[in-house]
Amino acid sequence: MTTPPLYILSDCHVGAAPAETTNALVHFLRRLRGESGALILNGDILDFWFEWRRSIPAFALPVLGALGELRASGMPVTWIAGNHDCWGGAVLRDTLGITYLTTPLRQTMGQWDVEIEHGDGLRGKADAGYLRIRPILRHPLSVWAFKLVHPDFGTRLALGTSEASRVHSAADNGLGLRDVALERIAQDGGPSLVVFGHSHVAGLTRAPNGGVYANPGGWGQVPRFLKLTADRIDLFEITSSGEDRRLDSVERKTDETLPHATERVGRIGRDEAVSETGYGT
């Protein structure tokens, strides 16, 4: 069991995102040093990641340095692979001491039963093409072959082809992943909280049975993060002045309060509302 608070963010796309959002990420990581709780990086933190024998992408160094400092301060860090940073290796695990996962994170966090997953490949027919190519991209033979490519050329090639993936992931304004999350929450014994990234659309959605779907949105567009405590989950945006501005908050429903869980049902538009104000674009 992980003890809250948990800080969750995703889709920073360092290497392709504006310098302002990458700098904000570095400052945020340094700000967490010495804090209690844990950090969850829910995929696509880097727009591309690969570990050659003696080389790694240079654009990642400021963020990796800040993560190393955060781990040295004692805060646990878990990195869940996305579709852009699925080739994690020894630098992340051994050098930095990060728990790097290529599978979803499922565990109890305080009073929450949580599932955290990046979200790529979950939308059925909408992701059919990606699902066909994903096993090839992640196959050990493909990884071995890519190590034969010069790091400069390999990095340039990967960054040059990544934009199409980012556009595709947000094509349905996050509704596909929202529906997947609500279906999981509705299952018998399902989680009380599902967190996805990938869509770049931020929002908190209450399920009819009281559970919650949360998405921090794309940090690479506007710095946002989720903060999970024992009683609630908050969605924050970091303003240009460096202050945390709460965009939304949902309390954890207990057995006593579940009869009132429908008070927020139907406010699916919160995802779209966040997008309409510019946070999810």
Spans of model-derived segments:
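Flexible, glycine-rich phosphate/dinucleotide-binding loops
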Residues: 15, 86, 123, 222, ...
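Core catalytic region of metal-dependent phosphoesterases/phosphodiesterases
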Residues: 2-9, 14-109
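C-terminal functional module detector
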Residues: 163-165, 173, 180, 186, ...
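Short acidic/polar alpha-helix capping motifs at helix-coil junctions
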Residues: 31-33, 70, 144-149, 165, ...
